[in-house]
Amino acid sequence: MREITPRKIIEMKGKEKIAMITAYDYPSALLADKAGFDIVFVGDSLGMVVYGEPNTLNVSMEQMVFHTRAVARAVKRALVLADMPFGSYEVSVEEGIKNAIKLIQAGADAVKIEGGYDHKKLVKRLVRMGIPVMGHTGLTPQRYLRLGGYRIMGSTEEEVEEIIRDAKALEKAGAFAVVLEFVLADVAKLVTEEVSIPTIGIGSGPYVDGQVLVWHDVLGLYEESPPFVKRYANLRDEILGAISEFKKDVKEGKFPGREHYWEFQDKEEFKRIKESVLRKVD
């Protein structure tokens, strides 16, 4: 069992901020764990930042299992959280249970489900089975078509009511935490005060119990990123510069240099081998 468990995350509420970051492969997960993140999250955002999809709706269970397995191999300390992709739990509770089990068997410590009140039965069943669940309300990318696109949530009484209802339903069903995405900070603060489980924000202000960002956004791997992101590096330019230099060296015959390859020390022996081999294959 890894050091950080759902129980540990619950105990951090109001005491220590929870740090969570996405990772989609072995090397990124290795670094995230070494950096000391509490939660390493295999998000369905991989559809967009890894596979170039316009949204998360086309991410499959097979993709999530594949990437979860890679991340789980790398992480020794942090809690490994895996997303339930669109279509993997909406049809029935039984279907959701089957797919959650696949992610746990791939090495996840917990699963995340978008939505709250509508999926309380599934959350309750999973928790009873021993599968920890994190909920997700506010802007739910898997439902962006219904929401009218990606926009900040919580500006109307109806939206605030829905967000609060979702969070409380998740709490009652046994979820150990809830993500609040792109929610007005006042509303995120209200939710944080109203539930006993930790709230983890993304674009929802400072009044939550923790924060999560996407790996590629933190590192500046794309030209554009969501407006709530703080870039901690601009690796796109650094990577582009490095690979451009490699291409230039290849074109100009500068790579490989003498230190990058090996030759026969005994040239006469190589001459003998060459003549022998060429006679045999002629």
Swiss-Prot record:
<dbReference type="GO" id="GO:0015937">
    <property type="term" value="P:coenzyme A biosynthetic process"/>
</dbReference>
<dbReference type="InterPro" id="IPR040442">
    <property type="entry name" value="Pyrv_kinase-like_dom_sf"/>
</dbReference>
<feature type="binding site">
    <location>
        <position position="114"/>
    </location>
    <ligand>
        <name>Mg(2+)</name>
    </ligand>
</feature>
<keyword id="KW-0479">Metal-binding</keyword>
<comment type="subunit">
    <text>Homodecamer; pentamer of dimers.</text>
</comment>
<comment type="pathway">
    <text>Cofactor biosynthesis; coenzyme A biosynthesis.</text>
</comment>
<dbReference type="GO" id="GO:0015940">
    <property type="term" value="P:pantothenate biosynthetic process"/>
</dbReference>
<dbReference type="GO" id="GO:0003864">
    <property type="term" value="F:3-methyl-2-oxobutanoate hydroxymethyltransferase activity"/>
</dbReference>
<keyword id="KW-0173">Coenzyme A biosynthesis</keyword>
<feature type="binding site">
    <location>
        <begin position="44"/>
        <end position="45"/>
    </location>
    <ligand>
        <name>3-methyl-2-oxobutanoate</name>
    </ligand>
</feature>
<keyword id="KW-0963">Cytoplasm</keyword>
<dbReference type="InterPro" id="IPR015813">
    <property type="entry name" value="Pyrv/PenolPyrv_kinase-like_dom"/>
</dbReference>
<feature type="binding site">
    <location>
        <position position="83"/>
    </location>
    <ligand>
        <name>3-methyl-2-oxobutanoate</name>
    </ligand>
</feature>
<dbReference type="GO" id="GO:0000287">
    <property type="term" value="F:magnesium ion binding"/>
</dbReference>
<dbReference type="Pfam" id="PF02548">
    <property type="entry name" value="Pantoate_transf"/>
</dbReference>
<comment type="similarity">
    <text>Belongs to the PanB family.</text>
</comment>
<comment type="function">
    <text>Catalyzes the reversible reaction in which hydroxymethyl group from 5,10-methylenetetrahydrofolate is transferred onto alpha-ketoisovalerate to form ketopantoate.</text>
</comment>
<feature type="binding site">
    <location>
        <position position="83"/>
    </location>
    <ligand>
        <name>Mg(2+)</name>
    </ligand>
</feature>
<dbReference type="InterPro" id="IPR003700">
    <property type="entry name" value="Pantoate_hydroxy_MeTrfase"/>
</dbReference>
<feature type="binding site">
    <location>
        <position position="112"/>
    </location>
    <ligand>
        <name>3-methyl-2-oxobutanoate</name>
    </ligand>
</feature>
<feature type="active site" description="Proton acceptor">
    <location>
        <position position="181"/>
    </location>
</feature>
<keyword id="KW-0808">Transferase</keyword>
<dbReference type="GO" id="GO:0005737">
    <property type="term" value="C:cytoplasm"/>
</dbReference>
<feature type="binding site">
    <location>
        <position position="44"/>
    </location>
    <ligand>
        <name>Mg(2+)</name>
    </ligand>
</feature>
<keyword id="KW-0460">Magnesium</keyword>
<protein>
    <recommendedName>
        <fullName>3-methyl-2-oxobutanoate hydroxymethyltransferase</fullName>
        <ecNumber>2.1.2.11</ecNumber>
    </recommendedName>
</protein>
